[in-house]
Amino acid sequence: MKNKKDKTQKPKVIDEKFVAFFKSLNIEPQNWQFYEDAFVHSSYVNENEDARASYDRLEFLGDALIDFIVAKKLFELYPNYNEGMLTRTKIEIVKGENLNRIGKELNFGNFIKLGKGMPYTETLFGDVLEALVAAIYEDLGIEKANQFVEEHIFKKTYSEILKYNFFSLFQEQKLPEPRVRVSLTSNNLVLSIIELNGDIIWSQAVPNSKHYDDKSVLEHNAMSAFTQFLKSGKGINFFSDIKNKLDSQKPMRALTVRPKKINWKARKPKLKALKNKVKADS
């Protein structure tokens, strides 16, 4: 007697849209059964005898895989982060609302199989995303699973990660929340300022080589530049100096990062004029 639940059984027919979907994800399945299982809800299995399995077990494995891959990526990217910051950043990336959103953006709803009357809840998309990562791992190995997580989870949450990390840097030092200001000059420079309690603690003026004019993009770039500055080692005593000056209640002198190959004698704005310019444009 043929066992309908035989785990080596291959699906007889693979939907063309399902094949095209994986091609769009740059995935070439070797064993399609893993991927079919990843999109089957337990309610569908209960109502259909031909259904092999639900995504429950794959979801369990995928949850652990995503945690591991993201943790490893953060460990490599942020050597100066302590255990607490690494943990909080990982939680921010893999939280359910992010996974649910990504699953919806990838149009998982076109392929999820549910029992009759079962609604499409938000958490379904995140569950299937976790199951899909496990399916990729089981079929193609950790390298391909790592590639998928980095491309579709890590990169898609990078802006949120950067913003979270930027403000966490100050929270970790028990400093007030900083303010980021950006402005464009007539000679195509991007002026970026970070303020603390109204004092400028860091500023940067760089050519707007990509001609960005979106304020959110410019602020994102400013936070990224500041974070990279700290990672470079140049800012090793940055926060301790800031805290000492706050404790002594002395005016803080801004640290300015200058670009190369710019005639600063002709272009260098005075700090006061720079601050007024940004305030006027904000």
Swiss-Prot record:
Active site: 63, 130
Listed GO biological process terms: mRNA processing; rRNA processing; tRNA processing
Cofactor: Mg(2+)
Residues holding Mg(2+): 59, 127, 130
Main function: Digests double-stranded RNA. Involved in the processing of primary rRNA transcript to yield the immediate precursors to the large and small rRNAs (23S and 16S). Processes some mRNAs, and tRNAs when they are encoded in the rRNA operon. Processes pre-crRNA and tracrRNA of type II CRISPR loci if present in the organism.
Quaternary organization: Homodimer.
Protein name: Ribonuclease 3
